[in-house]
Amino acid sequence: MVHWLADKGKLKLDENVANIWPEFGVNGKDQIKVNHILNHTSGLHNALAGVTEDPKLFCDWDECLKRIAMAAPETEPGRQLIYHYLSYGWLCGGIIEHVSGKKFQDILEESIVRPLNVEGELYIGIPPGVESRLATLAIDADDPSRLAPKAHPGIPSSLTLTSISNLIALLNILDGRRAIVPGGNGHFSARALARYYATLVDGGVIPPRHPSSSLPSLGSHPHHPMNKKDENQNQNQNKEDTTDEVETTIFVNPKAKIHDAFLGTGDYKNLTLPNGVFGLGFSRCRTAGGSLFGFGHAGLGGSTAYCDINNRFAIAVTLNKLCEGALTGEIIRFICSQLDLPVPLKYVGST
Protein backbone atom coordinates (compact mmCIF):
# COMPACT_ATOMS: atom_id res chain seq x y z
CA MET A 1 0.00 0.00 0.00
CA VAL A 2 2.94 2.32 0.64
CA HIS A 3 4.29 1.42 -2.81
CA TRP A 4 0.83 2.01 -4.31
CA LEU A 5 0.82 5.54 -2.91
CA ALA A 6 4.42 6.13 -4.02
CA ASP A 7 3.54 4.95 -7.53
CA LYS A 8 0.81 7.59 -7.61
CA GLY A 9 3.30 10.28 -6.58
CA LYS A 10 1.79 10.76 -3.13
CA LEU A 11 5.13 10.22 -1.35
CA LYS A 12 8.78 9.47 -2.00
CA LEU A 13 10.42 6.38 -0.57
CA ASP A 14 13.43 8.42 0.61
CA GLU A 15 11.25 11.05 2.28
CA ASN A 16 11.49 11.80 6.00
CA VAL A 17 8.53 10.24 7.78
CA ALA A 18 8.16 13.38 9.93
CA ASN A 19 7.39 15.39 6.77
CA ILE A 20 4.39 13.14 6.26
CA TRP A 21 3.49 12.47 9.89
CA PRO A 22 4.54 15.50 11.98
CA GLU A 23 3.82 13.85 15.35
CA PHE A 24 6.38 11.17 14.44
CA GLY A 25 9.36 13.54 14.40
CA VAL A 26 10.15 13.39 18.14
CA ASN A 27 12.48 11.39 20.39
CA GLY A 28 15.23 11.06 17.81
CA LYS A 29 13.03 10.02 14.87
CA ASP A 30 13.32 13.19 12.77
CA GLN A 31 15.82 11.54 10.38
CA ILE A 32 13.93 8.28 9.88
CA LYS A 33 12.86 7.91 6.27
CA VAL A 34 10.15 5.83 4.65
CA ASN A 35 12.76 3.46 3.22
CA HIS A 36 14.19 2.83 6.70
CA ILE A 37 10.83 1.52 7.82
CA LEU A 38 10.28 -0.56 4.68
CA ASN A 39 13.80 -2.00 5.03
CA HIS A 40 13.44 -2.74 8.77
CA THR A 41 16.33 -0.39 9.57
CA SER A 42 14.49 2.40 11.42
CA GLY A 43 15.56 1.20 14.87
CA LEU A 44 11.94 0.83 15.99
CA HIS A 45 11.97 -2.97 16.04
CA ASN A 46 10.95 -3.12 19.71
CA ALA A 47 8.44 -0.25 19.64
CA LEU A 48 5.21 -1.21 21.48
CA ALA A 49 6.99 -4.37 22.60
CA GLY A 50 4.52 -5.14 25.39
CA VAL A 51 1.40 -4.68 23.32
CA THR A 52 0.50 -8.39 23.29
CA GLU A 53 0.15 -8.21 27.09
CA ASP A 54 -2.45 -5.44 26.80
CA PRO A 55 -5.49 -6.63 24.80
CA LYS A 56 -7.22 -3.25 25.05
CA LEU A 57 -4.24 -1.43 23.52
CA PHE A 58 -3.68 -4.17 20.93
CA CYS A 59 -7.20 -3.60 19.61
CA ASP A 60 -7.00 0.23 19.62
CA TRP A 61 -5.61 1.29 16.25
CA ASP A 62 -5.56 5.03 16.89
CA GLU A 63 -3.89 4.67 20.29
CA CYS A 64 -1.23 2.37 18.83
CA LEU A 65 -0.46 4.99 16.17
CA LYS A 66 -0.16 7.68 18.84
CA ARG A 67 2.18 5.59 20.95
CA ILE A 68 4.42 4.47 18.14
CA ALA A 69 4.74 8.10 17.04
CA MET A 70 6.22 8.79 20.49
CA ALA A 71 8.62 5.82 20.50
CA ALA A 72 12.39 6.24 20.43
CA PRO A 73 14.66 4.26 18.07
CA GLU A 74 17.22 1.88 19.57
CA THR A 75 19.68 2.04 16.67
CA GLU A 76 20.72 4.71 14.19
CA PRO A 77 18.38 4.73 11.16
CA GLY A 78 19.75 2.85 8.18
CA ARG A 79 22.58 1.14 10.07
CA GLN A 80 21.22 -2.19 11.25
CA LEU A 81 18.49 -4.44 9.85
CA ILE A 82 16.38 -5.88 12.68
CA TYR A 83 12.98 -7.34 11.84
CA HIS A 84 10.20 -4.97 12.91
CA TYR A 85 7.66 -7.69 13.76
CA LEU A 86 4.41 -6.00 14.90
CA SER A 87 5.71 -2.41 14.88
CA TYR A 88 6.05 -2.52 11.09
CA GLY A 89 2.29 -2.54 10.54
CA TRP A 90 1.61 0.51 12.70
CA LEU A 91 4.53 2.40 11.21
CA CYS A 92 3.37 1.77 7.64
CA GLY A 93 -0.24 2.31 8.66
CA GLY A 94 0.52 5.75 10.07
CA ILE A 95 2.33 6.73 6.88
CA ILE A 96 -0.54 5.45 4.73
CA GLU A 97 -3.19 7.36 6.66
CA HIS A 98 -1.25 10.63 6.81
CA VAL A 99 -0.28 10.55 3.12
CA SER A 100 -3.75 9.65 1.85
CA GLY A 101 -5.94 11.45 4.36
CA LYS A 102 -8.01 8.25 4.46
CA LYS A 103 -8.37 5.38 6.91
CA PHE A 104 -6.08 2.40 6.52
CA GLN A 105 -8.86 -0.02 5.61
CA ASP A 106 -10.24 2.35 2.97
CA ILE A 107 -6.87 2.35 1.21
CA LEU A 108 -6.68 -1.45 1.54
CA GLU A 109 -10.03 -1.72 -0.24
CA GLU A 110 -9.11 0.83 -2.90
CA SER A 111 -5.62 -0.44 -3.69
CA ILE A 112 -6.00 -4.22 -3.38
CA VAL A 113 -9.35 -5.74 -2.45
CA ARG A 114 -11.64 -4.23 -5.10
CA PRO A 115 -9.23 -4.15 -8.07
CA LEU A 116 -8.21 -7.77 -7.50
CA ASN A 117 -11.78 -8.94 -6.90
CA VAL A 118 -10.89 -10.64 -3.61
CA GLU A 119 -13.85 -9.39 -1.59
CA GLY A 120 -14.62 -11.66 1.32
CA GLU A 121 -11.17 -13.29 1.23
CA LEU A 122 -8.70 -10.58 2.21
CA TYR A 123 -8.96 -8.53 5.39
CA ILE A 124 -6.85 -6.75 7.96
CA GLY A 125 -9.40 -6.52 10.73
CA ILE A 126 -12.58 -8.41 9.89
CA PRO A 127 -16.07 -6.85 9.80
CA PRO A 128 -18.96 -8.46 11.72
CA GLY A 129 -20.24 -11.69 10.19
CA VAL A 130 -16.95 -13.00 8.78
CA GLU A 131 -15.83 -14.81 11.93
CA SER A 132 -17.77 -18.00 11.15
CA ARG A 133 -15.52 -18.59 8.11
CA LEU A 134 -12.23 -18.22 9.97
CA ALA A 135 -9.98 -21.05 11.07
CA THR A 136 -8.76 -21.14 14.65
CA LEU A 137 -5.03 -20.72 15.19
CA ALA A 138 -3.36 -23.55 17.08
CA ILE A 139 0.21 -24.27 18.11
CA ASP A 140 1.75 -27.59 17.13
CA ALA A 141 1.23 -29.50 20.38
CA ASP A 142 4.06 -31.95 19.65
CA ASP A 143 6.67 -29.34 20.52
CA PRO A 144 5.42 -25.77 20.95
CA SER A 145 8.93 -24.57 21.84
CA ARG A 146 9.92 -25.05 18.19
CA LEU A 147 7.97 -21.87 17.41
CA ALA A 148 10.46 -19.89 19.48
CA PRO A 149 12.57 -17.59 17.26
CA LYS A 150 16.15 -18.72 16.78
CA ALA A 151 18.76 -16.33 18.18
CA HIS A 152 19.91 -14.03 15.38
CA PRO A 153 21.16 -10.42 15.21
CA GLY A 154 18.22 -9.58 12.94
CA ILE A 155 15.58 -10.76 15.43
CA PRO A 156 14.30 -8.18 17.96
CA SER A 157 14.56 -8.98 21.65
CA SER A 158 10.79 -8.54 22.02
CA LEU A 159 10.06 -11.48 19.68
CA THR A 160 9.94 -14.36 22.15
CA LEU A 161 7.93 -17.55 22.60
CA THR A 162 5.87 -15.73 25.25
CA SER A 163 5.03 -12.82 22.95
CA ILE A 164 4.14 -15.26 20.16
CA SER A 165 1.88 -17.26 22.50
CA ASN A 166 0.20 -14.05 23.67
CA LEU A 167 -0.30 -12.96 20.07
CA ILE A 168 -1.90 -16.26 19.07
CA ALA A 169 -4.32 -16.02 22.00
CA LEU A 170 -5.27 -12.46 20.99
CA LEU A 171 -5.80 -13.46 17.37
CA ASN A 172 -8.26 -16.17 18.37
CA ILE A 173 -10.63 -13.80 20.18
CA LEU A 174 -13.21 -11.78 18.29
CA ASP A 175 -11.89 -8.36 19.34
CA GLY A 176 -8.41 -9.38 18.21
CA ARG A 177 -9.72 -10.46 14.83
CA ARG A 178 -11.68 -7.25 14.34
CA ALA A 179 -8.72 -5.08 15.34
CA ILE A 180 -6.51 -3.46 12.71
CA VAL A 181 -3.07 -5.00 13.23
CA PRO A 182 -1.31 -5.03 9.83
CA GLY A 183 1.77 -6.70 11.30
CA GLY A 184 -0.19 -9.60 12.76
CA ASN A 185 -3.81 -10.22 11.83
CA GLY A 186 -4.13 -10.34 8.09
CA HIS A 187 -6.97 -12.76 7.26
CA PHE A 188 -6.50 -14.20 3.77
CA SER A 189 -7.46 -17.21 1.75
CA ALA A 190 -4.46 -18.79 0.05
CA ARG A 191 -5.91 -18.04 -3.39
CA ALA A 192 -6.51 -14.37 -2.57
CA LEU A 193 -2.96 -13.99 -1.30
CA ALA A 194 -1.57 -15.83 -4.33
CA ARG A 195 -3.62 -13.55 -6.60
CA TYR A 196 -2.08 -10.54 -4.88
CA TYR A 197 1.42 -11.83 -5.59
CA ALA A 198 0.42 -12.81 -9.13
CA THR A 199 -0.51 -9.17 -9.63
CA LEU A 200 2.81 -7.97 -8.22
CA VAL A 201 4.91 -10.39 -10.27
CA ASP A 202 3.52 -8.77 -13.43
CA GLY A 203 4.17 -5.27 -12.14
CA GLY A 204 0.59 -4.63 -11.08
CA VAL A 205 -1.27 -6.20 -14.01
CA ILE A 206 -4.39 -7.84 -12.61
CA PRO A 207 -4.69 -11.53 -13.56
CA PRO A 208 -7.78 -12.92 -15.30
CA ARG A 209 -10.62 -14.13 -13.12
CA HIS A 210 -10.28 -17.63 -11.73
CA PRO A 211 -11.88 -20.42 -13.80
CA SER A 212 -15.42 -21.47 -12.96
CA SER A 213 -14.06 -24.74 -11.54
CA SER A 214 -12.64 -22.80 -8.59
CA LEU A 215 -15.59 -22.85 -6.21
CA PRO A 216 -16.93 -20.83 -4.58
CA SER A 217 -16.02 -18.27 -7.20
CA LEU A 218 -13.49 -15.65 -6.21
CA GLY A 219 -15.10 -12.53 -4.78
CA SER A 220 -18.46 -14.23 -4.23
CA HIS A 221 -18.33 -14.13 -0.43
CA PRO A 222 -20.13 -11.11 1.06
CA HIS A 223 -17.36 -8.70 2.01
CA HIS A 224 -19.39 -7.16 4.84
CA PRO A 225 -21.98 -9.87 5.62
CA MET A 226 -23.99 -7.74 8.04
CA ASN A 227 -24.36 -4.95 5.49
CA LYS A 228 -27.09 -5.95 3.01
CA LYS A 229 -26.33 -3.02 0.71
CA ASP A 230 -22.70 -4.10 0.53
CA GLU A 231 -23.74 -7.70 -0.19
CA ASN A 232 -25.92 -6.64 -3.12
CA GLN A 233 -23.12 -4.50 -4.53
CA ASN A 234 -20.74 -7.43 -4.20
CA GLN A 235 -23.08 -9.70 -6.15
CA ASN A 236 -23.40 -7.11 -8.90
CA GLN A 237 -19.62 -6.70 -9.12
CA ASN A 238 -19.21 -10.42 -9.74
CA LYS A 239 -21.36 -10.38 -12.86
CA GLU A 240 -19.31 -10.29 -16.04
CA ASP A 241 -18.31 -6.66 -16.61
CA THR A 242 -17.84 -5.69 -20.24
CA THR A 243 -17.46 -1.94 -19.70
CA ASP A 244 -14.23 0.00 -20.17
CA GLU A 245 -14.21 0.88 -16.46
CA VAL A 246 -12.64 -2.39 -15.32
CA GLU A 247 -9.17 -1.80 -13.85
CA THR A 248 -6.37 -3.72 -15.53
CA THR A 249 -3.44 -2.65 -13.35
CA ILE A 250 -2.86 -1.25 -9.89
CA PHE A 251 0.38 0.58 -10.78
CA VAL A 252 1.33 3.28 -13.27
CA ASN A 253 5.09 2.81 -13.49
CA PRO A 254 6.74 0.10 -15.64
CA LYS A 255 7.13 -3.40 -14.24
CA ALA A 256 10.93 -3.20 -13.98
CA LYS A 257 10.75 -0.04 -11.88
CA ILE A 258 8.07 -1.52 -9.62
CA HIS A 259 10.16 -4.64 -9.03
CA ASP A 260 13.27 -2.55 -8.33
CA ALA A 261 11.29 -0.63 -5.72
CA PHE A 262 10.14 -3.86 -4.04
CA LEU A 263 13.62 -5.40 -4.06
CA GLY A 264 15.66 -2.28 -3.35
CA THR A 265 17.64 -2.68 -6.58
CA GLY A 266 18.34 -0.45 -9.59
CA ASP A 267 17.43 3.16 -8.80
CA TYR A 268 16.52 2.08 -5.25
CA LYS A 269 19.69 0.19 -4.33
CA ASN A 270 20.92 2.95 -2.02
CA LEU A 271 17.71 2.78 0.03
CA THR A 272 18.48 -0.65 1.50
CA LEU A 273 21.37 -2.37 3.23
CA PRO A 274 23.53 -4.22 0.66
CA ASN A 275 22.82 -7.97 0.52
CA GLY A 276 20.22 -7.65 3.28
CA VAL A 277 17.37 -10.07 3.77
CA PHE A 278 14.80 -7.36 3.01
CA GLY A 279 14.25 -5.06 0.09
CA LEU A 280 11.66 -2.32 0.55
CA GLY A 281 8.68 -4.00 2.18
CA PHE A 282 9.39 -7.54 1.00
CA SER A 283 11.95 -10.19 1.79
CA ARG A 284 14.27 -11.04 -1.07
CA CYS A 285 14.08 -14.54 -2.54
CA ARG A 286 17.44 -16.01 -3.47
CA THR A 287 18.52 -19.38 -4.79
CA ALA A 288 20.99 -21.56 -2.90
CA GLY A 289 23.63 -20.03 -5.17
CA GLY A 290 22.71 -16.51 -4.11
CA SER A 291 20.87 -15.38 -7.25
CA LEU A 292 18.03 -12.95 -6.58
CA PHE A 293 14.86 -14.11 -8.34
CA GLY A 294 11.81 -12.82 -6.48
CA PHE A 295 10.24 -11.40 -3.37
CA GLY A 296 7.65 -12.29 -0.75
CA HIS A 297 7.13 -12.59 2.97
CA ALA A 298 6.71 -15.37 5.50
CA GLY A 299 4.16 -15.22 8.29
CA LEU A 300 3.96 -16.68 11.76
CA GLY A 301 4.16 -20.45 12.08
CA GLY A 302 4.77 -21.49 8.49
CA SER A 303 2.39 -19.44 6.34
CA THR A 304 4.18 -17.79 3.43
CA ALA A 305 3.78 -16.25 0.00
CA TYR A 306 6.23 -15.19 -2.68
CA CYS A 307 6.64 -14.75 -6.41
CA ASP A 308 9.32 -15.66 -8.93
CA ILE A 309 9.86 -12.71 -11.28
CA ASN A 310 11.70 -14.66 -13.98
CA ASN A 311 9.04 -17.36 -14.31
CA ARG A 312 5.93 -15.26 -13.53
CA PHE A 313 5.03 -17.64 -10.73
CA ALA A 314 3.23 -16.85 -7.47
CA ILE A 315 2.34 -19.09 -4.54
CA ALA A 316 0.76 -18.75 -1.12
CA VAL A 317 0.62 -21.31 1.68
CA THR A 318 -1.65 -20.57 4.63
CA LEU A 319 -1.65 -22.67 7.79
CA ASN A 320 -3.65 -22.45 10.98
CA LYS A 321 -1.71 -25.15 12.88
CA LEU A 322 1.42 -23.16 13.54
CA CYS A 323 4.78 -24.91 13.38
CA GLU A 324 8.34 -24.00 12.48
CA GLY A 325 7.72 -24.30 8.73
CA ALA A 326 8.79 -27.85 7.78
CA LEU A 327 5.46 -28.62 6.10
CA THR A 328 5.61 -25.37 4.16
CA GLY A 329 9.06 -26.28 2.91
CA GLU A 330 7.86 -29.68 1.74
CA ILE A 331 4.96 -28.12 -0.17
CA ILE A 332 7.13 -25.51 -1.85
CA ARG A 333 9.89 -27.96 -2.78
CA PHE A 334 7.35 -30.37 -4.28
CA ILE A 335 5.62 -27.71 -6.37
CA CYS A 336 8.90 -26.20 -7.54
CA SER A 337 10.22 -29.64 -8.51
CA GLN A 338 7.10 -30.34 -10.57
CA LEU A 339 7.32 -26.98 -12.36
CA ASP A 340 11.13 -26.92 -12.63
CA LEU A 341 11.40 -23.71 -10.63
CA PRO A 342 14.10 -22.51 -8.23
CA VAL A 343 13.43 -23.05 -4.53
CA PRO A 344 13.95 -20.05 -2.22
CA LEU A 345 17.02 -20.52 -0.04
CA LYS A 346 14.80 -20.37 3.05
CA TYR A 347 13.12 -23.62 1.99
CA VAL A 348 16.05 -25.53 0.52
CA GLY A 349 16.37 -28.71 2.57
CA SER A 350 14.26 -27.41 5.48
CA THR A 351 13.03 -30.21 7.70
Predicted regions: what they are:
Residues 1-86, 94:
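Active-site-proximal loop and beta-strand segments within enzyme catalytic domains
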Residues 16, 121-123:
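Residues at or immediately flanking beta-strands
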Residues 80, 85, 97-115, 123, ...:
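Catalytic loop of the DD-peptidase/beta-lactamase superfamily, centered on the K-T-G motif
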